[in-house]
């Protein structure tokens, strides 16, 4: 399998005969609009093409993806239902799922799980791989700014969603999860709790924009917990991954 880091929380998964693009925000070029690994390569890649969006926030859902069907009329879009409810897309634009619902065809299964923000997180089952994209699921709190009650509630809400996921998927091959230093000193707490609760084979940080150092700071914790950790160094970076 090839994992492509596009930007922020945007990734692509390449397997034989299939490409999956998740939470596209911007393409990988830092200088040219609509240039990079998506426009220059992935949209031309042979095989099935799935485009997923976990929620309507603009750093996870760029309406430009709907224009890709002009080039690739075979695209299958799978979006979280909040995108429809917030009128970011029309009913006919995609297949919509929310927590507890599934999209499945002969190639892929996508189970929607919860979020501690809006929308969903997605668990993909593809060619013997289980792949979890957290969307905006995280223990979102800002220790220097949040009240004790806000911190407590964030912790309770997050652990409840992780528990629900663990009941269905106690082991996951590949996890893409927010590690965002803008949250302050406890910014890695949610990622650490996730790894402690769910047996994760490979962990990949996301949602850090250009802060590669902050995203990769979880590496030692993940390795000590028995995870393989993928350190990202630039937009458009590709990784050949085996179990």
Question: Predicted regions span which residues?
Answer:
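Binuclear metal-ion centers of metallo-dependent hydrolases, dominated by the metallo-beta-lactamase
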Residues: 4-6, 19, 88-103, 183, ...
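Pre-active-site segment of Zn-dependent metallo-hydrolases
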Residues: 12-52, 63-68, 137-168
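Active-site neighborhood of phospho(di)ester-bond hydrolases with catalytic His/Asp-centered motifs
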Residues: 21-25, 47-59, 77-81, 132-135, ...
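Active-site environment of divalent metal-dependent phosphoester hydrolases
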Residues: 28-29, 56-61, 83-87, 101-103, ...
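Active-site HxH/HxHxD metal-binding segment of metal-dependent hydrolases
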Residues: 38-103
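Active-site-proximal loop/helix segments of hydrolase catalytic cores
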Residues: 116-196
């Amino acid at each position: 399998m090839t994992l492509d880091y596009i930007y922020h929380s945007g990734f692509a998964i390449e397997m034989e005969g299939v490409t999956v693009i998740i939470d596209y925000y911007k393409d990988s070029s830092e200088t040219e609009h609509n240039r990079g690994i998506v426009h220059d390569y992935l949209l031309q890649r042979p095989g099935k093409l799935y485009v997923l969006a976990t929620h309507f926030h603009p750093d996870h859902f760029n309406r430009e993806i709907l224009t890709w069907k002009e080039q690739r009329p075979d695209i299958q879009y799978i979006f979280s239902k909040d995108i429809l409810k917030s009128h970011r897309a029309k009913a006919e634009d995609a297949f919509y799922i929310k927590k507890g619902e599934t999209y499945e065809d002969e190639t892929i299964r996508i189970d929607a799980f919860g979020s501690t923000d809006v929308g969903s997180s997605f668990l993909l089952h593809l060619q013997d791989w289980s792949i979890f994209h957290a969307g905006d699921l995280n223990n979102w709190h800002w220790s220097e700014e949040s009240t004790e009650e806000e911190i407590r509630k964030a912790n309770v809400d997050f652990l409840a969603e992780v528990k629900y996921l663990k009941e269905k998927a106690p082991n996951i091959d590949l996890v893409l999860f927010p590690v965002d230093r803008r949250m302050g000193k406890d910014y890695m707490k949610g990622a650490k709790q996730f790894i402690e609760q769910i047996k994760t084979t490979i962990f990949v940080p996301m949602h850090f924009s250009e802060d590669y150092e902050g995203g990769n700071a979880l590496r030692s914790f993940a390795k000590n917990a028995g995870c393989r950790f993928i350190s990202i160094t630039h937009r458009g970076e590709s990784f050949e991954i085996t179990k």
